[in-house]
Amino acid sequence: MPKIETPTDNRFVQNFIKNGGKFLYSENENEVNKNITLIIEENSWKKSNLISLDKNISKRFRLDYSFSKDSKDKTICLISTCEYLIADDGSILVSSNQVAEKKLDELPGDIIILAKTDQLINNISEGLSGIKNNSKSIPSNITNLKHFKDCNDKDFLSYGSSSKNLYLILLENQ
């Protein structure tokens, strides 16, 4: 009897939560706004502690758009989009389109990712192919966010990774 494969969206959510991520589903833009407000309230953040490197997000939520060494000290949370959501391991593929040339350890410890259901894919190979096919030029900084809870430095596979407190707000495509 053939093995029944779990749908891509279910597999992603299961692996994402297993990695320590916090998942919020939104049917429309109003729910996205409400979820962001709830996250901000839950963590007692101020808007001045939030930043985005995406002009559209910065404008939409009235956030700072610059990210310097000075702003890193007061910045608690980055709000960003992503390239793809990887179902096989529950990770989030980002590039210089979202995080500029910043390394993961240079980003704030708290991150809110805004994504749509059409960004769900099976594996990282599909994600890299998608970036190559959809980009005029391949982004210089491509990485994935996978460790959302404290990593054990004795775990060889997560050595050097920067764990993040990560929220994902997934918007249903209209």
PLM regions: where:
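The feature marks the mature, well-folded catalytic cores of soluble enzymes
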Residues: 1-174
